[in-house]
């Protein structure tokens, strides 16, 4: 070929290439004007298909240089099968980046997504349509988000019962990465806990998203909660740490964990104790309750086993809004001194011995101290019980000696041994009924009350003795008492004598209502 021809051919080729490049550049630079409406429509349709609902958006801007990029504000998504329910999610602002190849793939791949002000409202399936329920497997996703950052997210799981409080999770930091379509996303999250205040670190897997019933979306993970200040709950204090793992669905999560509080204190008792617990719980989104099954707690030489639930109620009627704790607790072989340290300031505690008890526990919501709101109803048995107050012990020893016909004074071993009774705690007042204990020569039965804060004692009852009144003294008094022996003797007993216990915890008074 002639050199001039080659030269003209090269010029034309370069010119054509330049023209094509110019056209492509013009198309890219002006893509926003003709591709944006198509892209907007495609994005909204993909969201509708993936999450099965209606999408509203206040603004959406898309650019294509140097790569596809979208920003939007005011996104609201409403599930079709949740008439009357809050939007499935609302979003204040978002930014998304994608590659050209990612957009051409099916499902479309979004390489990075930042979400600001995300609120998710997961309603359980009460209002799910028959068609949705019959669909079975959720539809395949139209979009895959490879990396998501959604700091400041709030997740709210709505119970079926509108009178119950929803479960709320305020997620301070949240990042997710996806390995591919129809596979769980891995997440790292920090949740800001309100009470007790602190940050919960969690990581695990989330999804795939269940568009038919979002509450059935799977979630697994581990958590760590450190240095939580319990003093925000009036009446108790200490620094709590907890760790554990969880699995299930958004609507029903199983949690297994443990807590450690080395400096736990109840204000009315004023004693520091090391409190450890292990627990298994179900966070039930269908009713907003947390089921505890069981909780094992240990402090000192005492182990407590409890099970129950934490329920929440909205404001309205005569109730107080908030969470109520309901527990069924028992101790099989505990140290009575450990129990008393919870509510009595003295050291040593008023009694030593081994205790067995069972109690119903209720802590309603409210602004008062926990010891004032705490409600107990149960029964107890104490084996080998012995009072530590020398004055009280001496008085009981004197009564024991008299009831055995020993008129020369008390012996050294006349201590109380076995106790049992029923107790009710309400408004800081411990009421005992059917309270009885044995001392050598007699059985004491009492009913009365003890104020946790006032420390006032007010008990009345009887002492049933093995010997008659006349045998508890000597001389002329003994002869005179023989005339009234039949009055005080009942059902074959020696005598039934009225008794009272009063005063305060630090200075108790005890005595018979007749003078021998």
Task: Enumerate the language-model features and the residues they cover.
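Coil-to-alpha-helix initiation sites in intrinsically disordered, low-complexity, charged segments
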Residues: 8-9, 99, 474-479
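N-terminal Sec-pathway targeting helices
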Residues: 3-21
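Intrinsic-disorder/low-complexity linker and hinge segments
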Residues: 129-141
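Terminal hydrophobic membrane-targeting helix
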Residues: 24-124
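Short acidic, Gly/Pro-enriched loop/turn segments at secondary-structure junctions
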Residues: 102-106, 121-131, 156-165, 388-392, ...
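Small-residue helix/turn framework positions
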Residues: 67-86, 111-112, 116-121, 147-149, ...
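Gram-negative outer-membrane assembly/targeting C-terminal domains
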Residues: 506-516
